[in-house]
Amino acid sequence: MQSVYFNRSPRFIRWIVLLAIVILPQAASAQWHATVGAQSANMGRQALAFLPNEIWIHEGDTITWKFNAGEIHTVSFLATSPTAQLRPAFSDGCPGFSSDPAWFDGSACVSTPPLVKGSTFTVRFPAAGNFKLVCLVHPDMTGVVHVLELSKPLPHTQYFYDEEAEAQTRALLSDSDREDNEDGLSAVHHSDEGQVIVGGGEISTNPGGASTLSIMRFVGHTPVIHAGQTVEWGTDDPEDPHTITFGTEPAGDPFPPSGNVTMDADGARHAIINSTSDSVHSGFIFAAPQDRTGLVQSPLSVTRFRVTFTHPGTYPYICALHDTLGMKGKVVVLP
């Protein structure tokens, strides 16, 4: 038996070596986990953030992101070499969307389509480098993945990142600088007409990038007005667009207003509703993007929408982008 064993040992050793070549790189790579987005129990507060938004890993490691919110997000890495890629629209992707799992080394774009709670996406990083992570839906939602050579020590464990993600989530969702209750009307609105604040939010940064709290609610008492009066909606959200939509939602692109919307002299959009069966869509109202040195300044955006109600009734409306998160309201019109 002993002689048979040694006669076969060279072949046996060769098989061991081959198996080691295949298995050891996989065994050496680590699997890391992070999350995308977070939300309050009623979905009214949305954390537009990668949690955590800064991770150190080794080359060959993978990260799996789990989507934890009803608001749409993407996990996207844009190409950086040989030249930096222009930022695409979230609906276009790289163009196109990546298979899962994906590989990223900076030479070609990787992006998910817009995803929501329950989805996951995994990326393997085969080469060392510092790679910016972005959400193509939300400009102020960024992060960074530091991919180190195998010889370099990692500063943190998965436990650290789990704790950091929980702490960042609590900090964003419990932000007390803003109140999203029914009495939280801002003092900057001076009109005597009914006022509704559309959304709200706050952008914060840390060494890893930017995160945003977004309030997916119409803030303020349900307007109670008389026939012939006007209600004005004004956006306080620094990041997300919203709509004010009465009746049937428009088919197709929700960006433009419906055909029965006009523009006032101050740039606000305006519509007249004569019946509870009328359909009116504001189109997107949103804050203008931040100006940047060396680029043409951003044009003014549409931040207000007004509706004049000619007849009594109760008029329900929604944000066509975020109604599934509970962003709904109504206007009560008395004689």
Predicted regions and their residues:
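Prokaryotic Sec-type signal peptides and long signal-anchor helices
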Residues: 10, 16, 288-290
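Bacterial N-terminal signal peptides
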Residues: 14-25
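Extracytoplasmic copper-binding redox domains, predominantly the cupredoxin/blue-copper superfamily
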Residues: 29-335
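Extreme N-terminus of proteins, especially the signal/transit-peptide cleavage junction
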Residues: 7, 26-30
